[in-house]
């Protein structure tokens, strides 16, 4: 329970919405094992683990190409690629590896389109904490209204502790949360990772310095 309390501090979401994992990658694979989606929409390029996890459960993978002439940003034509036979849409905000963010209005339109098509939207926000306007960009406030939304978060990026492995996801759908928990080992987060996460949340001055440095060097 302590690890969930830690994630509550980070996300301001109810404890019953939170599932902790051995890093965000652990939760990505759990998601695909739990959902077993037949048709998945990913962006290209994107973090390779999305495609690998989808392939393990036999999903048909379709790609939305991020184009140089669009500064590698998602455009409104993605809405046409989300169809009633789409089971899962996986996006990364900001995208890995391009570093680009989707306009907030378009992101909420994608979320609504997914609901219309009974599709799950998985939003990887693991790099969002680097942004100065992260509070305006996150879709965490939409979780209560959209049970078809899952948000991934991790401590390992901003706090430079990737080897410790600590991540979590948030979802308001109780059944989906139970399926996620059942799709992985029950003791996936070590005591060391829990303690590191608690310590990280007290290091706000460090986090602010990292954000400032990243902004200066972009």
Report each predicted region and the residues it spans:
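PLP-dependent aminotransferase-like
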Residues: 26, 33-91
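Short acidic capping loops at alpha-helix termini that bridge into adjacent secondary structure
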Residues: 14-18, 39, 125, 147-148
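Short, small-residue-biased leader/transition segments that mark boundaries at the very start
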Residues: 3-8
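Active-site phosphate-binding strand-loop segment of PLP-dependent enzymes
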Residues: 69-131
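Helix C-cap/helix->beta junction micro-motif
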Residues: 57, 116-117, 146
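Hydrophobic residues in well-ordered beta-strands that form the structural core
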Residues: 42, 63, 123, 151-153, ...
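Conserved beta-loop-alpha segment that forms the PLP phosphate-binding cup at the N-terminus of a helix
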Residues: 15-38, 167
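PLP-dependent aminotransferase class I/II
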Residues: 148-218
